[in-house]
């Protein structure tokens, strides 16, 4: 994978000139000049997904210049490098092969000359056998009762992905109750333990090293709680399984290593739901539906790795994002799913994007002088409309938005879904075209308002429009379509990282806080006054000690 400063390319310079021509062009003008704009700036995927990017401040020339940037930065070569098992995570000397986890074609993928697919398939088969025993009730707890509740204990990628997917696919869930514990705050584990019965609960401890502070603290608390009821430590093996590679630590915890599900160093945490980390997903929706999730992602992988840039959905969305982030100065993107089951989707890709591309040093080790990853946030519609859409419509910041919705709902109650989708369609129209002063004035005249009221109120009712959006319409949210949607965003993030010349698959930014916390923890165990830090940190620690008593 080549290291190319994007700002030094001819394409970047051409884009800068093009931006000067485009910065005052409105989306309304673009639609007025081209009645065929929707068909030119939209595409379908597998008859499952329609991506409409026509309501953006772009032209065919814009996309051509952005695609030139991708070519100059050798995006095609980078894609080949990732899919072929090259160690593109250079700071950790690792391959990046979440695509192998969902490689349903089973074509060999090599790391250090070894095909990884036999091991991938072996773990999948092990997950299938284990999950079927739990779901069927064949697996019994220490008192002979079947499992009714599953508690996934993990953090970051070991929590966000499985939680998001199990929520998004709740219509496919079986009888097992799923719970997720991540925060080291004891409240999180305590509240979950109030809901479950030690006789019928299975805990999944998700930690590759089996040393993650938050996860192991919660796991030991769960073990202590369990043993208060079960008594004999031999019963731990019937109620705990591990998603890990540290067999020694897993065995010492009391877990049968036959129930340890491994994954590999080429699986990044925030791309790990496709691996053994997804065992909670399998237990929730069944193995066949999990395979459908993998198949949807694999279909998007094929699209991404074989489709030319001008028709490649992850590439197009990535390039449009760079256009706003680096030329218009937009610092944020909102992900707005109009589906309540998808309520954790934005949070999942908040980690997926910000931990991947939140870097200020390029692949050569130099501080960048351009924007890298955007701030990602969002909530489900229509809730967001009554919370933060005000700023998106009439604020001073540009917030490019992705609107996501299914055409078919899993809960066809009355006309709920039509009302939901009417809002979905209305919001992107309102953001793009706004409402002019002339229209507002005419509305007030039609209502018989007096001129003084009209003059005062009208400015507050004007919508400038020209706010960019993408609309992603799914036929229905199924395991397959969700898998494809997740992979679409994963590859968008990768594409942006390649072009921005940063390492997308490490996360050194999470380390310093952990190191300092480990240094501070012993200082909190007594009542001595602390003076070893800066005055602010000393003051906070000392007040904490005084208040805790």
From Swiss-Prot:
Enzyme Commission designation: 5.3.1.9
Keyword Cytoplasm: yes
Alphabetical list of PROSITE patterns matching this protein: P_GLUCOSE_ISOMERASE_1 (PS00765), P_GLUCOSE_ISOMERASE_2 (PS00174), P_GLUCOSE_ISOMERASE_3 (PS51463)
Record note on disruption phenotype: One of the main features of pgi mutant is the overproduction of NADPH produced in pentose phosphate (PP) pathway which causes some reducing power imbalance that ultimately affects the cell growth. Cells lacking this gene grow slowly on glucose and utilize glucose primarily via the pentose phosphate pathway as the source of NADPH. They are also hypersensitive to oxidative stress induced by paraquat.
Entry's localization field: Cytoplasm
Matches recorded under InterPro entries: G6P_Isomerase, G6P_Isomerase_C, Phosphoglucose_isomerase_CS, SIS_dom_sf, SIS_PGI_1, SIS_PGI_2
Catalytic activity: alpha-D-glucose 6-phosphate = beta-D-fructose 6-phosphate
One CC-aspect GO term: cytosol
Modified residues (N6-acetyllysine): 80, 228, 234
Induction: Induced by oxidative stress.
Annotated disulfide bonds: none
Residues forming the catalytic site: 355 (proton donor), 386, 514
Name of this chain's protein: Glucose-6-phosphate isomerase
Origin species: Escherichia coli (strain K12)
């Amino acid at each position: 994978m080549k290291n190319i400063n994007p700002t030094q390319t001819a394409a970047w310079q051409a884009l800068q000139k093009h931006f000067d021509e485009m910065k005052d062009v409105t989306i309304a003008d673009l639609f007025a000049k081209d009645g065929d704009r929707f068909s030119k700036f939209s595409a379908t995927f597998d008859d499952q997904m329609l991506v409409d990017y026509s309501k953006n401040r772009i032209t065919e020339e814009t996309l051509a210049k952005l695609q030139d940037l991708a070519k100059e930065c050798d995006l095609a070569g980078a894609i080949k490098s990732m899919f072929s098992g090259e160690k593109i995570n250079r700071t950790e000397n690792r391959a990046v092969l979440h695509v192998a986890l969902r490689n349903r074609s089973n074509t060999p993928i090599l790391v250090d000359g070894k095909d990884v697919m036999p091991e991938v398939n072996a773990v999948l088969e092990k997950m299938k056998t284990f999950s079927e025993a739990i779901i069927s009730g064949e697996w019994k707890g220490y008192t002979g009762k079947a499992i009714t509740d599953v508690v996934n204990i993990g953090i970051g990628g070991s929590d966000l992905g499985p939680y998001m997917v199990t929520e998004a696919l709740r219509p496919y869930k079986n009888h097992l109750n799923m719970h997720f514990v991540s925060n080291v705050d004891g409240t999180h584990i305590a509240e979950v333990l109030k809901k479950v019965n030690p006789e019928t609960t299975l805990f999944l401890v998700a930690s590759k090293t089996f040393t993650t502070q938050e996860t192991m603290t919660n796991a030991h608390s769960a073990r202590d709680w369990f043993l208060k009821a079960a008594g004999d430590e031999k019963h731990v093996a019937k109620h705990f399984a591990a998603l890990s590679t540290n067999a020694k630590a897993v065995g010492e915890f009391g877990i049968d290593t036959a129930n340890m599900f491994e994954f590999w160093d080429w699986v990044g945490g925030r791309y790990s739901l496709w691996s053994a980390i997804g065992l909670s997903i399998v237990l929730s929706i069944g193995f066949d539906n999990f395979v459908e999730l993998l198949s949807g992602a694999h279909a998007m992988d094929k699209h991404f790795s074989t489709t030319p840039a001008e028709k490649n959905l992850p590439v197009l969305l990535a390039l449009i994002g760079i256009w706003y982030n680096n030329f218009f100065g937009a610092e944020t993107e909102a992900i707005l799913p109009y589906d309540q089951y998808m309520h954790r989707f934005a949070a999942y890709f908040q980690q997926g994007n910000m931990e991947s591309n939140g870097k200020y040093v390029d692949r050569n080790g130099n501080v960048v002088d351009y924007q890298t990853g955007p701030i990602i946030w969002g909530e489900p519609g229509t809730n967001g409309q009554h919370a933060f859409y005000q700023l998106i419509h009439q604020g001073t910041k540009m917030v490019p938005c992705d609107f996501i919705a299914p055409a078919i709902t899993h809960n066809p109650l009355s006309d709920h879904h039509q009302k939901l989708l009417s809002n979905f369609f209305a919001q992107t129209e309102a953001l793009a075209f706004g409402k002019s002063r002339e229209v507002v004035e005419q509305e007030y005249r039609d209502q018989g308002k007096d001129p003084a009221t009209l003059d005062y109120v009208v400015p507050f009712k004007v919508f400038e429009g020209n706010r960019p959006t993408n609309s992603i319409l799914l036929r229905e949210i199924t395991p397959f379509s969700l898998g494809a949607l997740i992979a679409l965003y994963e590859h968008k993030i990768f594409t942006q990282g390649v072009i921005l010349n940063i390492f997308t698959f490490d996360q050194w930014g999470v380390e310093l806080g952990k190191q300092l916390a480990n240094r501070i923890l012993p200082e909190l165990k007594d009542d001595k006054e602390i003076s070893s830090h800066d005055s602010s940190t000393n003051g906070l620690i000392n007040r904490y000690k005084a208040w805790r008593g």
